[in-house]
Amino acid sequence: VQGIHDALPLLGMNQLCKYKDNIDYTTANLIYDGINYYVCLTCFIDKDDTVYKRKNPIIGIDLGIKDTVTCSDGTKFNISIGESEKLKKLQRTLEGQIKGSNNWNKTKKKIRKEYIHITNKKNDVANKLVHNLLSIADIIVMQDEQIESWRQTTNSADKIQHSILGRIKSRLSYSDRVVILDKYFPTTKYCSNCGNMLSLELNDRIYECPVCKRKEDRDIHAANNMIYFYQQIKDRPGTDQTLKLV
């Protein structure tokens, strides 16, 4: 580091020590996020030949506001990471300080550091949840939900802001074992048992078909329908990872 001639302590080396000699380093970059310095290493390790046995050959997942993730097998994940009490206290302190003063600048720096901490926490939870989902199924089917549009069409802007829906969707889309259905598939309205279409309001949490009397949790019903639609069209010519309704 320019201007620093003494040795600096480096935290997190235990992440690399477990690989011993089976690791090759390529590049190293020093990153400054405005608060702390980080060393970003690009390296190669031997591929793990372990054959993973997953519980389900295929699952559907429904992203939502009430429950962050609902799986077709009934498993639900409800995650919300809002502003910390420490951040709220710092914001109140900032309001009583003179803009541009030394104390004001110190508080601004603390606020920025707390925001970085919250962002890192959201990223960590999203990474762990996506890893968990990918470890329980060979194929995951999800819908191309327009999460940003939910802010305008619902009164849940704060819940969406505190959720990690965008991170989950983005990370899952990178996997070649995740199938993304077009947003126009009627996964909530359609009854795969009898073919009936039933419109639901946002506060309707139970799907009950008036024709065949099928009754199911709304989100679990949608997740199972994603699997149904995928299996109906997966063998069509030209089908790719993003399946569209034609």
Describe the residue ranges of each PLM region.
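Positively charged, helix-rich recognition surfaces that bind polyanionic ligands
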Residues: 34-246
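Acidic carboxylate diad motif detector
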Residues: 1-31, 162
